[in-house]
Structure formats: C-alpha cells, structure tokens
Amino acid sequence: MKITRLTTYRLPPRWMFLKIETDEGVAGWGEPVIEGRARTVEAAVHELADYLVGQDPRRINDLWQTLYRGGFYRGGPILMSAIAGIDQALWDIKGKVLGVPVYELLGGLVRDRMRTYSWVGGDRPADVIAGMKALQAGGFDHFKLNGCEEMGIIDSARAVDAAVARVAEIRAAFGNTVEFGLDFHGRVSAPMAKVLIRALEPYRPLFIEEPVLAEQAESYARLAAQTHLPIAAGERMFSRFEFKRVLEAGGLAILQPDLSHAGGITECLKIAGMAEAYDVALAPHCPLGPIALAACLHIDFVSWNATLQEQSMGIHYNQGAELLDYVRNKADFALEGGYIRPPRLPGLGVDIDEALVIERSRSAPDWRNPVWRHADGSVAEW
C-alpha cells in the first residue's frame, strides 16, 4: 500500500480537512488547521507531502518521525498542526485497513463513555445564563466560559470586580447544579492573574484555564501555589517536549493538548501518558470540527486520566456550518446526558460527506483573527 495524493479543503466555518488517498482505494481524513492561519498550514501540509507520497501509510511512527526530524527546524504551531492532521489521516487509514477503531490499535477502551462540556460565549451574564440553561435542558452540566475581557498588564480594580461579579451572578443562577471552567485565554498578566484568581475562589470554578500565556508557563507553579483552584493549560503547547517542561515545573492540574495542533494522535498519546505519570488530568482542547473531535475521543478512550472532552456543538462562532454538518453517521456522535460513546466505525469512525465537503470548499471563508486594542491604543492579546 502506498500514499498517492493529499488533498486539502478549507471549509466553513473556519476549518480545514485533509484527505490522504492510497493506491488500494483506502482513504483517511485529518483536520490540520490553525484558525486564522489556514492557508499557512495548508502550504505546510503540501510541502510535507513530498515525504509522504509513495510511502506506506501504515508505518505511522516512521512517517511521523520523518516529518518531525526530517528538517533542521521543527516544532511550533504551523508545522505541528500540519503533522497533526496528517497523523490523524494515517491512523484513519490504518484502522480502516485492519477493520477496527483506532482505540483498539492503542490498547482498547478504559471507559465506556466520555464526559463532554460545552463552551458558552457571551459577555453579559444574562446571555451566558440563557445559553447554559438551553444546553442544560439538553443534558449538559459541564461548561466553559470566558473568564474576562482583555486586561492590561496592570489593570483597574473595576475590571477585576466586573469579571468577578459576572461569575458570581452565573453561580447564583445555578448554585452547585452545574460545573464551569473559566478560560482567560492568556489575556491576563501574572500580577493581575494572582489578584483575579484569588477573588474568584469563593465561586469554585471547576478550573482556571490559561490564566497566563504558554510563553509565561513558569508562572503556573507560582499561581497554583497561591490558590486551591485547579490550573489548566496546553492548547498552545505543541509537543511533548513543551509539556515535559511544565510537568516538571508543576502547577498544572489539567493538561489540554489539541489533537489538531500538538502532533496528532501519535504525539498526544505520549503527552497523555506523561501527564498520568505526574498525576495530572487530561482534557483535550477541541473547538474545531468532527475529525478533530474523533481524534480526541480515541485518546480519551485509552487514557485513564482523561476527564473532560471539549466539543463545539452550538458554539457561537460556528457560523456557516455546525459540528456534524459534514458527517454522515451523526448518530454515532450523539450525546447522552453530556456523555459520548466510543466511535464504532473502523479508523477514526467519521464517515465524511465528501461531496458536501467539495461543494462547501468552493466558498470557504478566508477568516482572520480580528485585532483588539486596549483603551490606550496598544494591541491586546487575542
């Protein structure tokens, strides 16, 4: 069996799918994308195709090492996202060839169902509460919310009070009938994060995500030492070597690698094992499409320390396509009381509607991150 072609499809809302074809007619799908940098990742995928065409897709480990070590420069979001999507597609092919889901190739199930959570957007508490209630009616009781708007390096007591008041109102609306994490998106400096996290403690959020940027990861241990709230991070770390440093430094209670950014299934399986050795939970980051979610689920179902899985059903920025619009076997990804069952089909278990993918790719949006600015005109963290 040999790889014959790689084809990429940029799609609404802001995703990109990859199809890898073989000379035996078996094809695999992956999802290599950085939202706002899809064209850049697409170029990287096709540049890496030179290492893949003519090779046996079943030699996943060898191909992964070739893509990673075959150049002098390595790592980073662009290259690792390209490798991630390729890796997903290779596992999809191998599972289809052998007639089993990918999790069977990774040792089999450690659980029968996986708890998921929903991301709820909105800045006004009333909007957030309404969104949570709608999802709660559908069986969800775990959520993730924005922790705050962008903050300056040293910001005002008013900004801190506004962020805390918002969380207090949400907690008052639900009591302890729901759990929610707070995502700061690295928009807070370490001095402000210390103040803000301490003020949020009475409202007992499930976790505090990315209180500071991954580039400031040395702050995680210091922040964790000053609070009883679990600190989560990892969506902007791209290899086991980056995760190794934060695990050794301590401070993180939850790792959140992204299966479409951190080298795919091959790399994230290693990251999950490293996290377990440090008694750290796993909650893969996944605001993307169905292939990325399926890849996450295969890691979740073989990793004992996997606790929560993010998914993007109903997320406010899925404009132009919903999570399962490009999937034929939608029932296989049905949620039951906030839980999802293991994929049942061979490979990743996603039956992609290729005709729809081709059609929608003809009008793909060229989405870019908006530039935000502070009141003084300086650029704010996105």
Curated annotation (Swiss-Prot):
Q: Name one GO molecular function term.
A: galactonate dehydratase activity
Q: Which transformation does this protein catalyse, written as a reaction?
A: D-galactonate = 2-dehydro-3-deoxy-D-galactonate + H2O
Q: What's this chain's function? A: Catalyzes the dehydration of D-galactonate to 2-keto-3-deoxy-D-galactonate.
Q: Which cofactor does it need?
A: Mg(2+)
Which Gene Ontology terms describe the biological processes this protein takes part in? amino acid catabolic process; D-galactonate catabolic process
Q: This protein is called what?
A: D-galactonate dehydratase
The similarity comment for this entry is: Belongs to the mandelate racemase/muconate lactonizing enzyme family. GalD subfamily.
**Further remarks about this protein from its record:** Reaction proceeds via an anti dehydration.
What does the record give as EC number? Answer: 4.2.1.6
Entry keyword set: Lyase, Magnesium, Metal-binding
Which parts of the sequence are marked as the site Transition state stabilizer? Answer: E310
Is-annotated flag, keyword Magnesium? Answer: yes
Q: Which residues bind Mg(2+)?
A: D183, E209, E235
Q: Does the keyword Magnesium apply?
A: yes
The pathway this protein participates in, as annotated, is: Carbohydrate acid metabolism; D-galactonate degradation; D-glyceraldehyde 3-phosphate and pyruvate from D-galactonate: step 1/3
Q: Which HAMAP family match?
A: Galacton_dehydrat (MF_01289)
Q: How is the cofactor bound?
A: Binds 1 Mg(2+) ion per subunit.
Q: What class of enzyme is it?
A: lyase
What are the coiled-coil residue ranges? none
Q: By its UniProt entry, which InterPro entries does this protein fall under?
A: DgoD-like (IPR034593), Enolase-like_C_sf (IPR036849), Enolase-like_N (IPR029017), Enolase_C-like (IPR029065), Galactonate_deHydtase (IPR023592), Mandel_Rmase/mucon_lact_enz_CS (IPR018110), Mandelate_racemase_C (IPR013342), Mandelate_racemase_N_dom (IPR013341)
Site residues by UniProt (Increases basicity of active site His): D258
The UniProt entry annotates the active site at: H185, H285
